[in-house]
């Protein structure tokens, strides 16, 4: 009798990619985080897409849209929690992936390492936008705190913060 993970067409793809991956025996569990990053990223994209279908940037109805997602949308509460906790899991996997690279000396491959640094900055910028743009006062607080970190840059810091804000201060609870 054949195992279903080896005979079913879709399960066979997952089995060959994650379980029976042809890899050297000296690869430890540290080398799994690249695949986990891909899984977390796909989960973030899919849940974010479905959450964006119910998004409203108006400060008067923002909280109502969150309660609408949690109460009225089928499994909306699950989408919201998967998206929030998936972001944390994504960054945990990302930092462990970087830690593995530091431990095994991958920084000696400068081209590859520099591409990884650029990807890290792109991920952090995307996460910042995802944190700042949605509903609620936390977005205004997050925008103020995170962008004020740039004011620590000598000579251009305060001008840079004013340029990012588009003025003297953040106006509404959402930056749309």
Swiss-Prot record:
The record's cofactor note says: Binds 2 heme b groups non-covalently.
Record-listed heme b b562 binding positions? 83
Q: Which InterPro entries match?
A: Cyt_b/b6_N, Cytb/b6-like_sf, Cytochrome_b_N_euk/bac, Di-haem_cyt_TM
Assign the protein's first listed, main location to one coarse class: mitochondrion
The answer to keyword Metal-binding applying to this record is yes
Q: Where in the cell is it found?
A: Mitochondrion inner membrane
Residue sites binding heme b b566 per the record: 97
A molecular function (GO) term = metal ion binding
- Named cofactor requirement(s): heme b
Q: Does the keyword Endoplasmic reticulum apply?
A: no
Membrane topology per record: Multi-pass membrane protein
Q: Keywords on this record? A: Electron transport, Heme, Iron, Membrane, Metal-binding, Mitochondrion, Mitochondrion inner membrane, Respiratory chain, Transmembrane, Transmembrane helix, Transport, Ubiquinone
**Transmembrane ranges?**
33-53, 77-98, 113-133
Q: Report which superkingdom the organism of origin falls in.
A: Eukaryota
The UniProt subunit note reads as follows: The cytochrome bc1 complex contains 11 subunits: 3 respiratory subunits (MT-CYB, CYC1 and UQCRFS1), 2 core proteins (UQCRC1 and UQCRC2) and 6 low-molecular weight proteins (UQCRH/QCR6, UQCRB/QCR7, UQCRQ/QCR8, UQCR10/QCR9, UQCR11/QCR10 and a cleavage product of UQCRFS1). This cytochrome bc1 complex then forms a dimer.
Q: What else is known?
A: Heme 1 (or BL or b562) is low-potential and absorbs at about 562 nm, and heme 2 (or BH or b566) is high-potential and absorbs at about 566 nm.
Function of the molecule: Component of the ubiquinol-cytochrome c reductase complex (complex III or cytochrome b-c1 complex) that is part of the mitochondrial respiratory chain. The b-c1 complex mediates electron transfer from ubiquinol to cytochrome c. Contributes to the generation of a proton gradient across the mitochondrial membrane that is then used for ATP synthesis.
**Family classification:** Belongs to the cytochrome b family.
In its UniProt entry, what is this protein called? Answer: Cytochrome b
**Organism the protein comes from:** Promops centralis (Big crested mastiff bat)
């Amino acid at each position: 009798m054949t195992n279903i993970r080896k005979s079913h067409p879709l399960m066979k793809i997952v089995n060959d990619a994650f379980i029976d991956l042809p890899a050297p025996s000296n690869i430890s569990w540290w080398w799994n985080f690249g695949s986990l990053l891909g899984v977390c990223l796909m989960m973030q994209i899919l849940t974010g897409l479905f959450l964006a279908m119910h998004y409203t940037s108006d400060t008067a109805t923002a909280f109502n849209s969150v309660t609408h997602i949690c109460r009225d949308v089928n499994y909306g509460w699950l989408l919201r929690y998967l998206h929030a906790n998936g972001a944390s899991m994504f960054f945990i996997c990302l930092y462990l992936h970087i830690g593995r690279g530091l431990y095994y000396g991958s920084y000696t491959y400068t081209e590859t390492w520099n591409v990884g640094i650029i990807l890290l900055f792109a991920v952090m910028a995307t996460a910042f936008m995802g944190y700042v743009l949605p509903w609620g006062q936390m977005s205004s607080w997050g925008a103020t705190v995170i962008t004020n970190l740039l004011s620590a840059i000598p000579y251009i810091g305060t001008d840079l913060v004013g340029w990012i804000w588009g003025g003297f201060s953040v106006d509404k609870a959402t930056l749309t």
